[in-house]
């Protein structure tokens, strides 16, 4: 089932320097909660500056949903320590609040209680909040409080030069983008390995179902927790953060222009369902527009091709201008065993898997084939640890045992690991392979199995509160390592100043400004 990558691996072993200079970045979302686990109702902490303009600390959907962002980094330890400093400083500034250590929220009874993230009075800030109002009215606020980790990854120019002979200009843009699209297609085919290993949301609180009927064979504990005994990541299931109305958009990952055309089509295609919500009611705006996507960011995807945007530029226009610059992996649950929601083992695994995905052959995929890849993901998400589970290839009928496919993949990853270790010295990447490959013979080692044991004993709420309390105490005690307190204060003040400047520069009323941007 695994494509034959032996030639590409042999090439890599002859050109190890092609992997020198991989760049990465991390984003981590987490809810601010009170000591009893309920959602914090306070505004974004003043000590953290302006969520609109802060470089490292912002908010996602809700005012209480923090998001930490590391700068682009070539050094794994440095990146993780930077992320830890953001958590250390924030933990000290949250008073009695703490950061929820799980992807799935628990003590939120009704979506209406969730305050949308606020970004001030500028047109840009109000637009961001209106976009969130639209998300709430379309999908419900509860779904939007699910949190995850995003891993951003780019290969060095040396890789593309060695692999495709490119230097710069239009030809380089096309070839590099084609290489990243190959990575993305392989991710759709084989990325289910991520929830298998690292999924950590095998259970949900009953409030999440909100009385909606479900066909899933949930088991229920006395404290109202619903779980599937072999599930890995309900966050990635239809109960979690997905968007069924987007499954037939026909967006494909074969070609830059085709992909962008699909995205642009979706933001212009009217939706009957969203038109029923209305765009405005009693003088209050309910969504930016009633199209299938209000803006491009609404496209739900487990992985995204990206380029840093210039001022006023849409993500797709940035891609057209310069091609794909990096990849954003969006399938990681919060790692509940790490105070910062992600750890070194995961980052090293993702490095290996990304390199494998870019090396392995990946025939072009129609939108139908793309939908077929969802079958494997759904199996792993809902019953990934089930004995005897099999997976298929795309829309074909042949089936293969998951443990065998996983071990075959890791045979390749081990060779990539040897190459990466040869550049960096040590055996860190190979060690990660040895640790993780054991999860295929023993699913009890996976994150989902480990956290489910705790959840069955303590409930989701009890588990979240215990871990959250322990991490709060730990982070508050640890000294900062990379950033100094003065740098946090300087960025707080600078971010507030930047927000004020944006607000002062606005001359156009919001309604007129929105008419141009909606």
Curated annotation (Swiss-Prot):
Its EC number is 6.3.2.2. Keywords: ATP-binding, Glutathione biosynthesis, Ligase, Nucleotide-binding. Pathway: Sulfur metabolism; glutathione biosynthesis; glutathione from L-cysteine and L-glutamate: step 1/2. GO terms for molecular function: ATP binding; glutamate-cysteine ligase activity; metal ion binding. GO terms for cellular component: cytosol. InterPro entries: Gln_synth/guanido_kin_cat_dom (IPR014746), Glu_cys_ligase (IPR007370), Glut_cys_ligase (IPR006334). It is an enzyme of class 6 (ligase). One of its GO terms (biological process) is glutathione biosynthetic process. Pfam families: Glu_cys_ligase. It catalyses: L-cysteine + L-glutamate + ATP = gamma-L-glutamyl-L-cysteine + ADP + phosphate + H(+). Belongs to the glutamate--cysteine ligase type 1 family. Type 1 subfamily. This is Glutamate--cysteine ligase. It comes from Salmonella typhimurium (strain LT2 / SGSC1412 / ATCC 700720).
């Amino acid at each position: 089932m695994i494509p034959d990558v032996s030639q590409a691996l042999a090439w890599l072993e002859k050109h190890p320097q092609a992997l020198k200079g991989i760049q990465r970045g991390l984003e981590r979302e987490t809810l601010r909660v009170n000591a009893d686990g309920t959602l914090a109702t306070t505004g974004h902490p003043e000590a953290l500056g302006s969520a609109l303009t802060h470089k490292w600390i912002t908010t996602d959907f809700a005012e209480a949903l923090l998001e930490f962002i590391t700068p682009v980094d070539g050094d794994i330890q440095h990146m993780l320590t930077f992320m830890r400093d953001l958590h250390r400083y924030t933990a000290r500034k949250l008073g009695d609040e703490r950061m929820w250590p799980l992807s799935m929220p628990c003590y939120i009874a009704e979506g209406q209680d969730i305050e949308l993230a606020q970004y001030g009075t500028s047109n840009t800030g109000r637009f961001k909040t209106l976009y969130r109002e639209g998300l709430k009215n379309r999908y419900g606020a509860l779904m939007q409080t699910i949190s995850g980790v995003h891993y951003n990854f780019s290969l060095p120019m040396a890789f593309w030069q060695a692999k495709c002979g490119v230097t710069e200009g239009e030809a380089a843009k096309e070839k590099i983008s084609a290489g990243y699209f190959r990575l993305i297609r392989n991710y759709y085919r084989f990325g289910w390995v991520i929830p298998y290993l690292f999924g950590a949301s095998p259970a949900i609180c009953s409030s999440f179902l909100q009385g909606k009927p479900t066909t899933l064979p949930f088991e229920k504990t006395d404290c109202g927790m619903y779980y599937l005994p072999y599930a890995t990541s309900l966050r990635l299931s239809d109960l979690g953060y997905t968007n069924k109305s987007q499954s037939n958009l026909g967006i494909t990952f074969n070609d830059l222009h085709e992909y962008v055309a699909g995205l642009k089509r979706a933001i212009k295609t009217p939706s009957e369902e969203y038109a029923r919500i209305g765009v405005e009611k009693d003088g209050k705006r309910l969504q930016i527009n009633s199209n299938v996507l209000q803006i491009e960011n609404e496209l739900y995807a487990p992985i995204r091709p990206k380029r840093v945007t210039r001022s006023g530029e849409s993500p797709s226009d940035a891609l057209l201008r310069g091609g794909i610059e990096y990849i954003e992996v969006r399938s990681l649950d919060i790692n509940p065993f790490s105070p910062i929601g992600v750890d070194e083992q995961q980052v090293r695994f993702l490095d290996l898997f990304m390199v494998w995905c870019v090396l392995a052959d990946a025939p072009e995929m129609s939108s139908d084939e793309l939908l077929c890849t969802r079958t494997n993901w759904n199996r792993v998400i809902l019953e990934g640890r089930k004995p005897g589970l099999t997976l298929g290839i795309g829309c074909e009928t042949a089936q293969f045992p998951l443990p065998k496919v996983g071990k075959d993949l890791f045979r390749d990853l081990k060779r990539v690991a040897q190459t990466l270790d040869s550049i960096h010295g040590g055996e860190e990447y190979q060690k990660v392979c040895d640790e993780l490959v054991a999860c295929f013979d023993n699913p009890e080692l996976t994150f989902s199995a480990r956290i489910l044991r705790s959840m069955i004993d303590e409930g989701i709420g009890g588990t979240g509160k215990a871990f959250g309390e322990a991490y709060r105490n730990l982070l508050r005690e640890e000294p900062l390592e990379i950033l100094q307190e003065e740098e946090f204060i300087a960025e707080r003040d600078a971010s507030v100043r930047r927000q004020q400047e944006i607000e002062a520069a606005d001359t156009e009323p919001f309604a007129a400004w929105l008419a141009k941007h909606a």
